[in-house]
Design a protein with these regions (language model features):
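A short linear-motif detector with a strong N-terminal bias
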Residues: 84-89, 194-198, 273-277, 326-328, ...
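A broad, low-specificity signal for short, low-complexity segments enriched in glycine/proline
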Residues: 177-180, 258-259, 318-325, 415, ...
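Short, polar loop/linker segments at the starts of domains and inter-domain junctions
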Residues: 119-132, 308-312, 392-402, 411-412
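Extracellular hydrolytic enzyme modules, especially secreted metalloproteases
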Residues: 205, 215-374, 386-387
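Viral virion structural and adsorption modules
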Residues: 479-486
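Zn2+-dependent metallopeptidase catalytic core
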Residues: 2-271, 348-354, 441-443, 449, ...
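Extracellular low-complexity, Gly/Ser/Thr-rich intrinsically disordered linkers
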Residues: 341-477
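Short, surface-exposed, polar/charged, turn-prone segments marking secondary-structure boundaries
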Residues: 135-139, 324-325, 387-391
């Protein structure tokens, strides 16, 4: 067993410092691979035993109030917004622009370095991003076609590889490319834009005609820091250039970068930031698991080793109108809830059907298509608080999975999801209400009267009684409403 040496401590803290850059500025980084996460946990145990937990006091705690760009999809420089606009409003505008639908064009630039050359062909990336029926586990195009219910068609081109003016070691800068000091990964992305300018008409990639390229992707030679944990390898992320790069009557600013052996899940996750404004829904300070393997924007980007990423969660889909969100305004009996991939429907529940930042969402997820490698299948219930920026505080997530077994293993970091999270699931839980464990009370411990009862799964279809008021459910029989005892 590896000894907890000072060198191990230094290496661990460097990885955590690089990873925590997603809590600062405009960086949104991919979650570490399961293998790296396990290694970090093992190292953490050894270091705590040898040096004591106090060495982590400034590293592993939530970062508190952060700058604009934390886990959001800031796509334009701050000075492009009206003077005096609040940071939270800027974040909201960046993430809540009109959904991109129809053909969405993506430019992919390949780059290598004098100390690390490209070993793959351009066709491999053409297939990974834009092919149909070519890859056994699917392409970016096929992934977004499925999860958006056909509303988004990813298209574009691959150019390069271009030799960068600096080495990989220089851009990584010992900090996985995410350090503040130049050169870093954003310097690399700017150099990539300059190198590709003569071959690319960047105006074709401003899909919503707001004056900014929507998806500028840089694929670099070498491995990703999210898998190796090495400061000499660039950690996949979404960030912004050091300054706006003007080309072809438009602006290049936001970008994402992934390594040459990039997995579909990494690409789809980072495009979730860049194109659709999704925040990271894993815990970016790594003290918990966020919503784990249930969502592309959390650990689900790594399902099947990153080859078969999970669908975005129902909350993400609702932000982009990829699903029909049914607001439950009256108690209903015997509601049939098919797999969201078939029904394209999720359910919103709160006291009396009220609006506001806090509420519950429910969707049915089964193990098929890109959801094939989910940790379980059944009814997923989420506790949402849109007033919260991220999933960094395990006591109060922005988007939380209400785990049916009540063990809160996602918050505790015990796993990235299991069959006990869903309803009825492995724990065979049939009722969710004010009085069950887990319960439907608000974060302020106030009864909401939300209930999902008599939960049953038959051939992949969930049926349940839905409650948002104290009192009986209503059933529709021969076009007449009759009261039904709870």
């Amino acid at each position: 067993m590896k000894k907890a040496t000072p060198e191990l401590l230094e290496g661990y803290l460097k990885i955590m410092e690089a990873a925590n850059k997603s809590n600062d500025g405009n960086r949104c980084m991919i979650a570490p691979s399961p293998e790296l996460k396990k290694r970090l946990k093992d190292d953490l145990k050894k270091i705590k035993k040898q040096f004591g937990a106090s060495v982590f006091s400034n590293i592993l705690k939530p970062m508190g109030k952060t700058k604009v760009g934390l886990n959001d999809a800031l796509l334009r420089p701050g000075n492009s917004f009206p003077l005096g606009m609040s940071a939270s409003r800027v974040k909201s505008i960046a993430a809540d622009r009109l959904p991109l639908q129809g053909t969405v064009r993506v430019i992919v630039v390949l780059v290598d370095f004098s100390d690390k050359q490209f070993s793959n062909t351009k066709k491999q990336y053409q297939d990974l991003f834009f092919s149909e029926g070519m890859l056994p586990t699917g392409s970016v195009k096929e992934y977004y076609k499925e999860v958006t219910n056909g509303l988004v068609d990813i298209a574009g081109e691959i150019v390069g590889p271009y030799r960068m003016p600096r080495t990989l070691a220089a851009y990584a800068h010992g900090e996985s490319g995410t350090g503040d000091a130049a050169p870093n990964a954003r310097t690399m992305a700017q150099d990539a834009a300059k190198a590709a300018n003569s071959a690319v008409d960047f105006s074709l990639y401003d899909n919503d005609h707001d004056g900014y390229v929507d998806a500028f992707v840089v694929i670099h030679a070498g491995k990703g820091g999210e898998e190796t944990g090495q400061g000499s390898d660039i950690w996949s992320h979404k960030w912004v250039l050091p300054g706006v790069y003007n080309a072809d009557g438009t602006h290049v600013y936001a970008y994402l970068t992934v390594p040459e052996d990039c997995k579909l899940g990494v690409c789809a996750h980072e495009l979730g930031h860049l194109l659709f404004g999704f925040p990271d829904l894993y815990d970016t300070d790594y003290t918990s698991e966020g919503i784990g393997d249930w969502c592309l924007m959390a650990g689900g980007s790594w399902n099947n080793g990153g080859l078969t990423p999970a669908h975005p969660c129902g909350w993400c889909k609702a932000q982009q109108n990829w699903v029909n969100t049914v607001t439950v305004s009256a108690n209903k009996k015997g509601v049939a809830i098919p797999d969201v991939k078939d029904s394209k429907t999720i359910y919103r529940l709160w006291k009396d059907g009220g609006s506001g930042n806090e509420y519950f969402l429910a969707e049915n997820r089964t193990k098929k298509n890109f959801d094939k490698f989910l940790p379980g299948e059944g009814l997923l219930i989420y506790h949402i608080d849109d007033a919260i920026d991220s999933n960094s505080n395990e006591m109060h997530y922005k988007v939380a999975v209400v785990q049916a077994d009540g063990k809160k293993q996602l918050e505790g970091g015990a796993n990235r999801g299991d069959a006990g999270d869903v309803w009825p699931g492995a724990s065979k839980k049939l009722t969710f209400s004010n009085t069950t464990k887990p319960n439907s009370k608000s974060y302020g411990n106030i009864k909401t009267d939300v209930g999902i009862k008599k939960i049953k799964s038959t051939a992949g279809i969930i049926t349940a009684d839905l409650f948002v008021k104290a009192g009986p459910a209503l059933a529709i029989v021969k076009s007449k409403l009759r009261k039904v005892k709870k």
